[in-house]
Structure formats: C-alpha cells, structure tokens
Amino acid sequence: MAPYSLLVTRLQKALGVRQYHVASVLCQRAKVAMSHFEPNEYIHYDLLEKNINIVRKRLNRPLTLSEKIVYGHLDDPASQEIERGKSYLRLRPDRVAMQDATAQMAMLQFISSGLSKVAVPSTIHCDHLIEAQVGGEKDLRRAKDINQEVYNFLATAGAKYGVGFWKPGSGIIHQIILENYAYPGVLLIGTDSHTPNGGGLGGICIGVGGADAVDVMAGIPWELKCPKVIGVKLTGSLSGWSSPKDVILKVAGILTVKGGTGAIVEYHGPGVDSISCTGMATICNMGAEIGATTSVFPYNHRMKKYLSKTGREDIANLADEFKDHLVPDPGCHYDQLIEINLSELKPHINGPFTPDLAHPVAEVGKVAEKEGWPLDIRVGLIGSCTNSSYEDMGRSAAVAKQALAHGLKCKSQFTITPGSEQIRATIERDGYAQILRDLGGIVLANACGPCIGQWDRKDIKKGEKNTIVTSYNRNFTGRNDANPETHAFVTSPEIVTALAIAGTLKFNPETDYLTGTDGKKFRLEAPDADELPKGEFDPGQDTYQHPPKDSSGQHVDVSPTSQRLQLLEPFDKWDGKDLEDLQILIKVKGKCTTDHISAAGPWLKFRGHLDNISNNLLIGAINIENGKANSVRNAVTQEFGPVPDTARYYKKHGIRWVVIGDENYGEGSSREHAALEPRHLGGRAIITKSFARIHETNLKKQGLLPLTFADPADYNKIHPVDKLTIQGLKDFTPGKPLKCIIKHPNGTQETILLNHTFNETQIEWFRAGSALNRMKELQQ
C-alpha cells in the first residue's frame, strides 16, 4: 500500500480537499470551541455565512432554516446543483457521533480504510449494550463484564484514531450530544436514526449508516439527496397535560411513518417559544418515526437558556451574533405546510405496533375496548433518548407526588431511565428520583435499555397478550421485549406516570378521578416543573475518555477466534454481467422494519461480528407464502426452514438471491447490519414498492441494488417460486430504469421495469462491490 501521505493526496484530488474553515472575519472575533472536550476545534459561523450568501445570490429567493444550514455546509456552494428532492449534495459535516452497537462496524470499516486519524471531531457512546434486569448499578456492572471485549475494542480504537469515548454508564448518545456537542447551525451525522434529537438545539443532525460515517471521518464529502422541506407552523402555547411529545405524536398521525421521507421537517411560528429546548429535542427525535431526514427548530431564547445552563454561554453569545442565519427567512417556501394550534392540542397516545396510529388519551380506552387490546397496563416505562430530560423527570415526579400524597403507588410496574449521568445525578440531588422510587419505580442504568429491546422481562411469557405504555419513540411488534403480543403505546412521561398509577388505558387524567387510601376521590392536577434546575447541573461521575495526543503506540486487537468481533473481508466486485436467474429468498408481506431485517435485543452482542449476526437475517419478516415469520421455502430442497439457513444454503451452492418487499421497506433504525447481512449471505438486490431513506443508502453502500417497482402493482406479479433476471446493468446510468424478467415455474415470462435512485458515484460503489472498496480503489 502507498504511504499514508500519498493516499491522502490521491483521495483529496479525487474527492475534493476538505475546506478547513478559516476566514479573516473570524480573526476579529473570539474563537469559540465546539465543545469543552475539543478546545481546538472551533465553530465557524463565518464560513456558514459565506456559503449561505453564495447560495442566496444563486437562487435569488428566501431560504428556509434547513436550507441555510444544509447549503451552508456545501463542499462547493458556487457550482453545486441544488434542486429539492432531485440533486445530490456534497456536504462537509462538522462532526460524527456513533453509538456502541453501530460504532463497532463503523470503526471496523474505518480500520479497513487504512487511514490513521479521523478528519473531523468524532465520538463513541456506550449506551446500547446494557440490558435492563434489576436496576442501574447492578445492570451496569453486569454489562461491563459481559461486553468487556467490545468496550475495550471501542476504547482502544477511539484512542488510536482520535475518537472521543464515552464509557458505559455515561448516558444515551443523543442526550450526551445535546448536553455537550449540538449547537445552532451544526451539521452533525450520527450512526443512529434518532440523531435528529439535536434539532432541538437548532442543528441539522442526521442519522446515517456506519459507511456514511466512515466517509466523513475520512474527510470525504458526504452525499445527501437535496431534501424537501415540510413546514410545521406552531401557534398558541402548550398548557395543562399537553406536552412537546404530543406535537410529534400529532404530526406522526398526520404524516404517517413514511410521510416525511426525503424531507426535513422545520418547525416555526409563534408557538415555538412556548416549548423548552429539551422539548424541541423530543419533537425532533421522534421525527425519525415519520421517515424524515431530520427535523429542526429555529434558534431562540429557550436554546440560549439551555446552552448557558450546560456551560456553553460562549456558544449562545456567538449564535446571537449570527442569528439571522439560524432562523428561516420571511416568505420562504415549504413543500408542504402543516399548522398546529398548541392551545388546542390534546394529550395523545400512539399505538400499538406502529408509532403513527394516533389517539387522544381521552379516546384510547374506548378504541382499545373496540379493538380487543388489553386494557390493563402491565408496565409503564419513562425515559429513553426521546424523553429523559430534567423537565421530563420533573413533570413525572409532579404527578407521582400527588398520588403519594393520597397514599397511592403504581398499579403497574414502573421503570425510569435517566438520559445521562448528568441527568441521573441531578434528579437524585433534587429529589425527583426518590419520589419516583417511592411511587414504586425502578431506576435503570443511564442507557437505552427496554427502548431497544435490552430488557430481560420476567412478568410475562412469550406470546402472552399484554399492554405496556412508554415515553419511548418506537413500538414495532416485539421491539421492546421480543414478545409479538405486547401492545406497546408511546406517549409523554407524565401521561405514562398517570396511567401507571391508574393501571388502565381507560383512565383519562384530564377528567377522571382516583381514590386515595382514605377513600376520598381526587383528580390529578396537570404537572408543572422547571425546564432546567435552579442551580447548576450535577455532572455526576466523569465518564469521558479523551483520545491521546500521541497514539502511535496504541494497539487495537481483534482476536481471530472472537465471537463478538470480526475484521471485515471486502465484498466481491461486480462481474460486469446482468444478474441472471436470481432466486427469491423471501417475498415479504406488509411492514418490514430494520428490526425485522436485523433484530436488536439479544443480537446486539454480535454487532461487531458480521457472520454471527447474519444468523438473524429477516427472522422477523412475514413470508407472504405461508404467513409465518422466519419460515421460507428452499427452492432446491423444497423444504421450509429459517431465513438465515436458507440464505446460507444458497450462498454455499452459488445461488444468488433477491428479496421482494412492500412499502417503506427498512423503516426504523439506521443499523447498517440490515444491509451488510444480505450482502454477506449472497443477496444481490432488494426490490420493493418503496424504501426508507437510511436503509436505501445503506444498501447502496454495501454494493446491493435497492430497486423499486415502476408500477407498484407489479409486486403482485412476482411469486416466491419465481426466478428473476435483472438486465441493463452494463448501461447502468442515473435515471434510467432497469429491466426485470420474471420467470414463472410453468415456463411463462413477464417483463417489468424497476426504478432506482443511484447517481454516478453510487453506481461506482456497485461496480466496485461497496463504497469502501471504491474508497480503496481511489487510494491506489
């Protein structure tokens, strides 16, 4: 391999030199660091301003806030083609964040790139591998023991390549980012679909797969299809039991799980000022559930207040100077506009099984009775990256305190997940944690826990029909506890707390009464709590590891016999031929999320070992042939068996295969394992009615063909026993459909067209076998 300096020169020549943001204007102002942890990495609003002005002159129209931040980070603002929903933008993100479940594969890919240091500030956050069993400290100790090999790999890889490392117990990635790294106008990418949480602090924060993160860490311009912009105008003000969570629950009901695909959701209007900064983060966080690229709020005094309280008053002061670039222009155009009067917004609860099935809390009991959903609530769970702020915990404690005053405790089991060590320490100091314990709650570790399926649930048997209510973001079938009969509903933390006290979905805290131990009836008053502590936050324990200045002696070891970690082998290049006689591994019926494609929960321990985790490929998807999960016909033996076993059989016998999917295939998590696994086991194409954004990109990155039916009705022409030939790959060009020949067992054939969204760069990924392979080609 060529020397590192030569490789970098070649990469820069081929892909564009990273613009290090220095301008004479900045010299006249005090430099402000991006974070306390990176004192030599500065915020460069001057370059943002310069790029915005270039684009504004070109487009000659008012700009949305989303456009200002995105176009302000263009690699070449003077010549970049800009057309919403069509052109691919080459961007220069400010930083990268990775959680431990996705960081393993991202760092393994970065190691494979041959580069010696990350080109932008980057961090790893240990939050996904801690299973909830009995409570915080014990669960954390157990996780450190079980996951020692993975934590050691991530810590040493971070030290070797210049990546900050947040140790297990530090908190959930998105809360840590909000407290320390997000700021107005930042462009941040994260290997988690809820990265948009940072939009609550006025940043464009986008969830991506690990391969995208590798590009940015390598200093390569990052590609994003120019997003459309959906405006949500907020009027009135929140009050009573209505909360920020109800805004996004309402929006999800309007837009559905795919209504935001390819768009940034931009909140604006006079109602914004009635929402706290962390409340805005809640709304942006759950924007992932409508398929949005990200969501964002304009910079205002609530953000300034939060920045100051988290020790970043210097950033707030700098943002004040550039505020015109951190809010939308008057008269800017939105591709779609939704208006919500916050004064009329009622508390909502969404579910079960999908986050866009919205109900007012006042009506969900009647709907549940009609649908036959279990009314009794077995467990109420508050916290998660969506709702674990100081204000969230305070409002829940305010509800709990009223019940305790009347001698009541929860009828349901009740758990609390602090979002970070800082939140945990502060709610302990200020008494909120004890109030919630007194109600019957168990405080879990500062981690994702049950929200992502890390829950060793003991109170039910698998297959037992039951209801849980959470303040989380997703409620897909089996997501929280691997039980397909758990009816999970998402709502605000204070509503979860009230429902856990009552123990039933039929309870409406706005109108219904509870009976105290003295026999007297009382009604819960709407909770009120401070959005931020009156004093300073308590930082708690120090859980951050700085990368050393000199990492030349740092080693990163991956044992060849490890069951948790595995160095990556490059995928084969395209052989230059059309794809002939592809076997159909599975024709999926209905919803197929990344949880269905690559389950989390007990499988998280294999996130760094591609071959082992591939044993969960599509085990949650429903086979249209028999209506069952993880049961497909082997076309050779004609026997039904698990999906991964069948895929391995095909791979062993040189049979290439394809998956047929329905609408919004791959919605949910950003996990790129859902793309790596089919590629590893011999898949060549995924053909669907439509894709979720992140998953479609992840498939392209790994050399697969994500294709969509030109006519969605053609989905019905394909049967699981057919074979498919995909033609036109020799002339594979942007915008030109590919031809698919369907070969039926009776000898008849049909020809259909398949669309794609590949651009020239992405076609090169396919030809090279993967984006990582293409990166290596450019180094030679």
Curated annotation (Swiss-Prot):
Substrate binds at Q99, D192, S193, H194, R474, R479, R607, S670, R671. One of its GO terms (biological process) is tricarboxylic acid cycle. Residues 528-560 are annotated as: Disordered. GO terms for molecular function: 4 iron, 4 sulfur cluster binding; aconitate hydratase activity; iron ion binding. Pfam families: Aconitase (PF00330), Aconitase_C (PF00694). The keyword Transferase does not apply. It is found in: Mitochondrion. Forms covalent cross-links mediated by transglutaminase TGM2, between a glutamine and the epsilon-amino group of a lysine residue, forming homopolymers and heteropolymers. Pathway: Carbohydrate metabolism; tricarboxylic acid cycle; isocitrate from oxaloacetate: step 2/2. It catalyses: citrate = D-threo-isocitrate. Residues 551-560 have a biased composition (Polar residues). [4Fe-4S] cluster binds at C385, C448, C451. Residues 528-537 have a biased composition (Basic and acidic residues). The keyword Iron applies. GO terms for cellular component: cytosol; mitochondrial matrix; mitochondrion. InterPro entries: Acnase/IPM_dHydase_lsu_aba_1/3, Acoase/IPM_deHydtase_lsu_aba, Aconitase/3IPM_dehydase_swvl, Aconitase/IPM_isomerase, Aconitase_4Fe-4S_BS, Aconitase_4Fe-4S_dom, Aconitase_dom2, Aconitase_mito-like. The modification N6-acetyllysine is found at K50, K138, K144, K233, K573, K605, K723, K730, K736, K739, K743. Binds 1 [4Fe-4S] cluster per subunit. Binding of a [3Fe-4S] cluster leads to an inactive enzyme. Belongs to the aconitase/IPM isomerase family. Monomer. Catalyzes the isomerization of citrate to isocitrate via cis-aconitate. This is Aconitate hydratase, mitochondrial. It comes from Homo sapiens. The gene is ACO2.
